[in-house]
Amino acid sequence: MARKSDFKTVETDLDELEEKIRKHRRKIAKRIIIVVAAVVALFLIVWLWMALRTYKSFDVKNSVEQKDKSAVSFVDFCGAVVEYSNDGVLYTDSDGNRIWNQAFEMSSPQVVTCESFMTIYDRGGTDLYIMDKKGVKKEIGTSWPIIKACIASQGTVAVLVSQDENYYVKLYDVNGKELASGEFFGEQKNIPVDIALSYDAKKLAVDMIDVSGGKTDSVISFYNFGSVGQNEIDNNVGTYKYENQLIPEIAYVSDSRMIAVSDQNIMVFDGSQKPKLKQTIKLEKLIDSVFYNNKYIGVAYSNNDKNCTSHIKLYDFNGKMLMENDTAIAYNSIEFDSNNEVCVTGDTACEIYTIHGVKKFYHTFDNKLYKLMYKSGMNNYIFIYDGAMDEVRLK
């Protein structure tokens, strides 16, 4: 009997021990949940504070004296500054130190960048350069005047040239070797006005105006230079026609996504092999300007309100409107910076908006403002204006 009683006691003790262990585990789990919830709440509070915070001034961290830059244009390229004019191009860091430069003579220099490569070409001329962060990779001379050029992420360039009523699209690799060529005859009433090259250089789109029917239609043709396109006539993997619409601009924003901007809509095409129309964003009226990067697209409309010269709307590529704001700045440019913020730049004033519609920063300057660029780090920017280039931190 004693043994049986002892067995019950041991069994009871084990049950009590297991219950104590369960209670202890529950306490630990509750503490972990409380700590995690507190950390998440703190993170959200900090994130909201940062997202909604506005700035009215800045500290100058570094200032570089600049000569007259009235005839110079500026581009943000790989975190440094490209300055270009009719006489050449200069690539400097934020301290004003020269990384490289290239002299040339162009009547209308244009710069296009894609990740770590860029091209500078003379619109209406015959000169084109392929460049990267180290300098010139290749200089290409075309036989006929250049209408448009674009570049892919590995340095491949597509060039639209014209001679009389004939138009040619040529593809060159980073070493200047011709990879492909196509001809479009103006006498057939299809006149190319723009081209777009995917980041991987495997797909090319040609935007044409069709005036054969006595009215203005637009035609976009897609070409694939990979294995899929080799099975199609002239590598053509799709053509879209838009009646009574003028499409002046097309652009690839990734390997597989292209946008087309018409006088009525913005069309978004997707497809790694054969692009298909994914989304159409209806425009309220004629836009003054359009700006985009690989995540978002924005438009600016004229505003009849004397206090607000323009109305800005921002969309994702699914057509969802993310923000809209009015600006009183008579802007020279509206663009995304490398931090996905919207920068509005006027002669002597600028604004920075977040994609959530918060006016993060507004400032007026004593001198003419040429360029506003984001610099890596929290609230770091570069202001380029008449007489100086300043690296600043908002406060």
PLM segments and residue spans:
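Hydrophobic membrane-insertion alpha-helices, especially the h-region
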Residues: 30-49
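Solenoidal tandem-repeat scaffolds enriched in leucines and small polar residues
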Residues: 167-265
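Aromatic (tryptophan-biased) beta-strands that constitute blades/sheets of beta-rich domains
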Residues: 53-71, 93, 97-106, 136-142, ...
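Structural motif
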Residues: 88-90, 126-130, 165-171, 212-224, ...
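N-terminal Lys/Arg-rich, disordered targeting/topogenic segments
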Residues: 1-30
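Repeated scaffold domains used in trafficking and secretory/extracellular systems
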Residues: 67-76, 105-116, 144-155, 188-197, ...
